[in-house]
Structures are given as structure tokens and as C-alpha cells.
Regions:
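C-terminal or internal capping secondary-structure element at the end of a domain, subdomain, or sheet
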Residues: 158, 163-166
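Short alpha-helical functional segments enriched in proximate histidine and acidic residues
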Residues: 35, 69, 121, 166
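Alpha-helical scaffold segments that form or flank carboxylate-/histidine-based iron centers
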Residues: 9-27, 42-65, 93-110, 133-158
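Short, helix-capping/interhelical loops that line the mouth of catalytic, cofactor-
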Residues: 1-19, 65-117, 128-132, 169-211
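Acidic interhelical loop/turn segments
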Residues: 40-49, 116-150, 170-183
């Protein structure tokens, strides 16, 4: 005889849905900022993938788009200068890397200010508040704050993940400092990596691939 179905007890003090979204958004911002700490000018800027992904560029990109989605979409205004978005002939990917004339401090301050401005705009809105994303297709432009917070959280987590990998490629630093990685010595990590590599080679061999 199967046990009767039970309903889990309700959380005595559930978090407001908007507060939950904002808390996770703040956590991803902090994770992204943390990946740029303690690096040289070269390391914080240099591209580590074929498509040029770099840490300072990720911060510049997120700073640029979050103020668009979380401020401008809902009628907010700001005085942030983002010349890489100006004009019809703007350079592709200009928001994804920092020029030699753009200081690290300028990009970090842009990130902090865009976060503050975005949060100030969102603070006065309900999740069902409506806005318009002018750069989206006409049939999708009208949105709610709920939609955009989820979209921006997805965007932020996506790029925080990029930053995690790029930082590990730069100097081996990994994780978020909140116990998300097991405590292992360099030798243990080397042995673990070799096990993964050996398994990949064996799987390829069984599939008839040459490695």
C-alpha cells in the first residue's frame, strides 16, 4: 500500500518574488565583478577565446545592456556615456572589449553606476509593470518587469559563467568563494583532470575516432 500524498508545509515567511529576482541579480553582478579582481591590465583585457571573450569586456557589455533593459525600457533616464552605442555605423562588438583609452576604473564605475540606476528604476515598479524594448521585434517589444528581470538575470548568469571560465584560463582561479568547488590540492585537481581526459579518449576510441 502506497503512502498517502502529502502537501509540503508552506514556507512561514516566503520571499517576495521580486525580491528573489533582485537578490539573484545582485549575486550574479558580484560574481562578475569578482572575476576581474587582482589582475594586471593585460590579463583583465586579453581575449582568451576565438571570439575574443575577455573579462573587462564582459563587464562593459553587461553594464551597457542592463541600463537599457532595466531603465530605458520602463521610461527611465540616465546620463551614462556609452559612445559605442551611438550612431548608425556603430562598430560590431564595440561593447565587448575595452580600448587602451578606456581605463579599468571607468568600466568598473560604469558597471556600478548602471547597476545603481537600474535598481533605482526597478524599485518603484511592480512585476506586472509594462515597458517597451525598442530594439526588439515589434511583436515582442511590449514586456513586463517580470519578463525583463528574468531576461536580465539570464543574461547576467550567462556572462558570469563566461567570466568564470576566462578567469580560470588566466590564472587558474575558479569558483565563487561560496564553497561551490570541493577543496582539493593542485595534485588532486591534476589527477581529476587526467581522469576526465582519459575517459574522453576512451570514449573516442570506442566510437572509432582518432585522438
Amino acid at each position: 500500500m502506497s503512502a498517502p500524498a502529502t502537501t509540503p508545509p508552506a514556507n512561514p515567511s516566503p520571499e517576495d518574488p521580486k525580491d528573489t529576482l533582485l537578490r539573484y541579480l545582485a549575486r550574479e553582478r558580484a560574481a562578475l565583478l569578482g572575476k576581474a579582481e587582482g589582475l594586471s591590465e593585460h590579463d583583465v583585457r586579453r581575449p582568451l577565446t576565438r571570439t575574443g571573450t575577455n573579462l573587462l569586456g564582459l563587464l562593459k557589455h553587461v553594464a551597457s545592456v542592463q541600463v537599457g533593459y532595466l531603465c530605458e525600457t520602463f521610461g527611465g533616464t540616465h546620463d551614462l556615456a556609452m559612445p559605442w552605442f551611438d550612431g548608425e555605423d556603430m562598430e560590431v562588438n564595440a561593447d565587448m572589449w575595452a580600448t587602451a583609452d578606456e581605463s579599468r576604473e571607468e568600466i568598473l564605475e560604469l558597471f556600478r553606476r548602471s547597476s545603481e540606476i537600474s535598481d533605482e528604476t526597478v524599485a518603484g515598479l511592480d512585476l506586472d509593470a509594462r515597458g517597451e524594448v525598442p530594439w526588439w521585434p515589434p511583436e515582442r517589444r511590449v514586456v513586463t518587469l517580470h519578463q525583463i528581470l528574468v531576461h536580465m538575470l539570464d543574461e547576467m548568469a550567462h556572462h558570469a559563467g563566461h567570466a568564470d571560465i576566462v578567469r580560470e584560463l588566466v590564472d587558474g582561479a575558479a569558483g565563487n568563494g561560496r564553497g561551490d568547488l570541493p577543496e582539493q590540492s593542485d595534485a588532486e585537481w591534476t589527477a581529476y583532470r587526467q581522469r576526465v581526459e582519459d575517459a574522453a579518449v576512451e570514449a573516442a576510441r570506442r566510437a572509432g575516432e582518432s585522438v
